From Swiss-Prot:
HAMAP family: Alkanesulf_monooxygen. It catalyses: an alkanesulfonate + FMNH2 + O2 = an aldehyde + FMN + sulfite + H2O + 2 H(+). It comes from Rhodopseudomonas palustris (strain TIE-1). InterPro entries: Alkanesulphonate_mOase_FMN-dep, Luciferase-like_dom, Luciferase-like_sf, SsuD_RutA_monooxygenase. This is Alkanesulfonate monooxygenase. Belongs to the SsuD family. The gene is ssuD. The keyword RNA-binding does not apply. One of its GO terms (biological process) is alkanesulfonate catabolic process.
């Protein structure tokens, strides 16, 4: 079978700061996810040619900002997709964190805007807002955050956020700011995305459903004079033959019991995330009909929240499925697989030769001479511009 020639795309990998292993739903084959292991995955992704890595966020994960700042110096080209959390962070503090990390790692920061879809976890973090209120906060947050990163002074009195004389002294390296990635399948989420972000993300639904969502988001954005790009979040299980790939998929959930599935689905059911609801509906908690679309397998979502589907097959088959998503407008693929170190190699070695990358043409312009030049004055002003010494 000859693989179709695919259009250009960016491929990102994943740093599993919430755990890793050979199997789901068990500690058998589990792996110690320490700094050395995360660094190893990042360095492998860098050397293999991935565009970047996603760092997850939430109470089940290590802090993504701390991990990114620790791992990034060990890589050269790899970008880091790190989450800001409207409602948990002040937009001014988040802007300073963003600018600082972007400067420290040389313009390799990507920003993932995460509103949060689990009311129980949100309350544990001190957020007692309804679904739509969270998106109201996200909109206000992003307006302030983007203005600060673009060098503007911000004075705003919103429903949820009030800022007086907000300023960012030290700008990010990327101009006007690092790219903003965002996923939200509800009407409120799409409304915010159309006005504020650069790349809209979806979880790995079948191509027809992804096409419907992409067309809807694109139409809303175009009505408002904006143009978005689109990405998808998927797992991958690629082997040299289709038979070996499907055997690996079955093996991944060999220890998952019905009780484990029921417990996981109970947690997912409490969430008010429309995206999570759509993921759960793909399999309905049943393990007998997991191939929901050709080579798209929903087994991961039986016990894992968020991204719950995987592309399964040999390299040519997986490349063909990737092209189906590209044909409906997807240009960025955020991927993962178990264990994450080994699967990063498999995908890169087996599939990268069959797909094109647009890395070189997808770099945000960088600022030159961003300073600072000398210590700030009274913690308020940048030093005066350098003046020529009079003779």
């Amino acid at each position: 079978m000859t693989a179709p020639q695919t259009p250009s795309s960016n491929f990102l990998w994943f740093l599993p700061t919430h755990g890793d292993g050979h199997y789901l739903g068990t500690s058998n084959g589990g792996r110690d996810v320490n700094f050395g292991y995360l660094r190893q995955i990042a360095q492998a992704a860098d050397q293999l040619g991935y565009f970047g890595v996603l760092l997850p966020t939430g109470r089940s994960c290590e802090d993504s900002w701390v991990v990114a700042s620790a791992v990034a110096p060990w890589t050269e080209r790899l970008r880091y997709l790190v989450a800001v959390r409207p409602g948990l962070q002040s937009p001014s503090v988040a802007a300073r964190m963003t600018a600082t990390l972007d400067r420290v790692i040389g313009g390799r920061l990507l920003v993932n805007v995460v509103t949060g879809g689990d009311p129980v976890e949100n309350k544990g973090d001190g957020v007692f807002l309804s679904h739509d209120e969270r998106y109201e906060v996200t909109r206000e947050f992003l307006n302030v955050y983007s203005d600060l990163l673009s060098g503007k002074t911000v004075n705003v009195a919103g429903k949820h956020i009030t800022i007086e004389d907000g300023r960012l002294l030290f700008p990010p390296v990327q101009s006007p700011r690092p790219p903003l990635y965002f996923g939200g399948s509800s009407d409120a989420g799409i409304d915010v995305a159309a006005d504020t972000v650069d790349k809209y993300l979806t979880w790995g639904e079948p191509p027809a459903q992804v096409a419907e969502k992409v067309n809807r988001v694109r139409a809303v954005a175009e009505q408002r004079g904006r143009k978005l790009s689109f990405g998808i979040r998927l797992h991958v299980i690629v082997r040299e033959t289709n038979e070996a790939a499907w055997a690996a998929a079955d093996d991944l959930i060999r220890y998952v019991t019905d009780d484990t599935i029921a417990a996981a689905q109970k947690v997912f059911a409490r969430m008010d995330s429309v995206g999570q609801q759509r993921m759960s509906e793909l399999h309905g908690g049943r393990r007998d009909k997991l191939e929901i679309s050709p080579n798209l397998w929903a087994g991961v979502g039986l016990v894992r929240g968020g991204a719950g589907t995987a592309l399964v097959g040999d390299p040519q088959t997986v490349a063909a499925r990737i092209k189906e998503y590209q044909d409906v407008g997807i240009d960025t693929f955020i991927l993962s697989g178990y264990p994450h170190l080994e699967e990063a190699y498999r995908f890169a070695e087996l599939v990268f030769p069959l797909v094109k990358s647009l890395h070189a043409g997808n770099v945000t312009p960088l600022r030159a001479n961003t300073g600072p030049f000398g210590e700030t004055i009274a913690n308020e002003h940048l030093p005066n511009a350098k003046q020529a010494v009079k003779p």
